[in-house]
């Protein structure tokens, strides 16, 4: 199966939206979705939401939060990046 890495996954809009798009793709069923963000609190919140949705809908995906970027990208098949530069 594929390893899909989402860099900047802690964003409620990008993270959850992209995870939902992946969940809807029949060709990606069984993939591991690696969530990465430098904000560990946001990463935890998105991971919990994704896991809850995955379990509720009995989806065949693995969700893996990783705070180390190099570890997250190791052996990735796909990488989607959405980050904000600078301060809000």
List where the protein language model places each region.
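Metallocofactor- and cofactor-centric catalytic cores in central/energy metabolism, strongly enriched
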Residues: 1-88
């Amino acid at each position: 199966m594929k390893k899909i890495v989402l860099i900047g996954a802690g964003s409620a809009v990008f993270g959850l939206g992209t995870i939902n798009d992946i969940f809807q793709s029949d060709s990606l069923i069984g993939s591991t979705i690696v969530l990465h963000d430098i904000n560990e609190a946001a990463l935890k919140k998105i991971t919990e939401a994704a896991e809850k949705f995955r379990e509720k809908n009995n989806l065949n995906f693995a969700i893996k939060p990783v705070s180390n970027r190099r570890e997250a990208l190791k052996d990735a098949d796909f990488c989607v990046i959405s980050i904000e530069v600078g301060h809000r």
